[in-house]
Structures are given as structure tokens and as C-alpha cells.
Amino acid sequence: NRVNPDDLPFFYALLKHLHDAGCKVPQFITDRDGQWLQTVAGRPACLIEFLDGVSVTEPTAVQAYSTGAALGHMHKALANFTLARPNSLGVSAWRPLALRCTADGLESIAAGLSERVFAECDYLEAHWPSNLPVAAIHADLFPDNVLMLGDHVGGLIDFYFACTEIRAYDLAVTHSAWCFSNDGTVFDTDVSAGLLAGYTDIMPLDAATQAALPILLRGACLRFLLTRCYDWINTPANALVTRKDPLAFLRRLDFYSGPSEVENLFRHRA
């Protein structure tokens, strides 16, 4: 339901490009005539290849290293990918999304949350980098979108938030998703070091990107905080869908907002 049918050719081309470059991603399955897009019950439909592996809930530093390297290889492969898709959940979308949540809705989740969210929107809009490399990114590489075979990555899946964005923002999203306990209360320095080492062994970060990383990390947290807030406010309590705790990403945001925390990320690298 969340996929715009007009975006399907972008996703198809993206996955084919990555597959042809040797990245472990699923492929669209074609019919005898070579067509990958069908119509079922009046709606667009396609079949996606199955990949072996399991998603981990408590990743190890070694698994994080493998994931960082896989993300780096994906970014390297996408350097010459020419199609583009706007990021509908980028920095320009966060304030409108916060307004749709309403101040009362945000306050129903936690006292003071509305003021915190809009202050963060102000800060990020004023400081969002404009001089970093832009490319196609995954934008949602949580542990449940990485299939592990032991300590090795068996596949990267669920590219339906893929878009054109600052490349390092993808690393920020992945870091915020992988390096904390599920509730955001515990930061794992070993997993962080592994993830960053795996990525930078493939895609080294220049000084400008390292300097911008604190902003990108905060942006990643605000994005998921807001989408979780919106779902929390607008999903009935008796719905079959399980709502995800927005405050897990507020805690991450608070962590990354610490003045020395991001410098420590690189200090703790293996």
C-alpha cells in the first residue's frame, strides 16, 4: 500500500543495477515474455526473489562490520546510477509532518515533545549540509532489512524507501538503527565501531562528511521519531498493526545531540 506504482520502475532499475554490480539484493522475477510488472485484481504486482538469511535483533560487532561493508559496497555500486527519486521524508518534510502530528498529539506521547520536535526542526533546517555527495540510498537499513548468514550478509532487502539523498545520510540512518538497544536506552560502542570500520574500509569519509555527521545523525533520528509519532497518533489502539515506540528515537536523538558523542564514535573505532 505504501508504494506508488509510478516508482516501481525506479526500484526495478535500482535492484538490477545493484545485482549486476555484485551486490546481494533480491531481483524482480520476470515472466516468459521478460515482463516483471503484472496486474492482479486491478493492481500492479510483481514477484521478488527469495534470499537466504535471518534478521538479527541483537547484532554483534562482527555482524555490524559486515553490514557496514555491505552498505559501502552498495554506495560504491550506486555511484554511477543515474535515475533519481526525491526523498519524500527528507529535511523539507519534517516540519510539515510534525504539524500533521499536531502539538496536542505530540504532547500526548510525552510532555514537552512538541517544543523539542519543533526546536529540532529549526536547528536542522538551519544546519543541514548542502555540499555533500548525493546519490541513490537505501534510507531504511534497519537490522530487519539485512539478512545475515552467521557473521556475513546474505542480502539487503526492502528498498521501498530508496531515494536520492545525501549519501552519508544512509550511514546515519543505519548507525541509528543498529547501534542502540531497541528502546534507545543503551548505545553499543562495539557495534558502532564495527559498523563504521566496515563502511569506511570501503567508502572512506572525507573531512566534510565527518564534520556533517552529527547533523545527519540527528536528522535520521528526527525522521523516524516523527513517522513513529504520526503512526502512534493515527493508528487505533485495536488495529492489527503494532505501533512502534517513538521515544526510542527521541532517546537516540538526545544521545547524538551531546556535544562530544560523535567525536567519540570515531575514537572508539577498532
Predicted features along the sequence, with ranges:
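Active-site activation/catalytic loop segments of kinase-like enzymes and analogous catalytic loops
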Residues: 168-204, 219-236
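A cross-family kinase active-site recognition segment
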Residues: 58-112, 134, 240-241
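Structured catalytic core of nucleotide-sugar glycosyltransferases
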Residues: 15-16, 21, 25-38, 42, ...
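All-alpha amphipathic helical-bundle segments outside canonical DNA-binding/catalytic cores
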Residues: 207-217
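ATP-binding pocket architecture of kinase catalytic cores
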Residues: 1-83
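Anionic ligand-binding catalytic core segments
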Residues: 152, 167, 181-186, 248, ...
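ATP/Mg2+ or Mg2+-diphosphate-binding catalytic cores
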Residues: 100, 224-270
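Active-site acidic catalytic loop and adjacent metal/ATP-binding pocket
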Residues: 28-30, 122-169
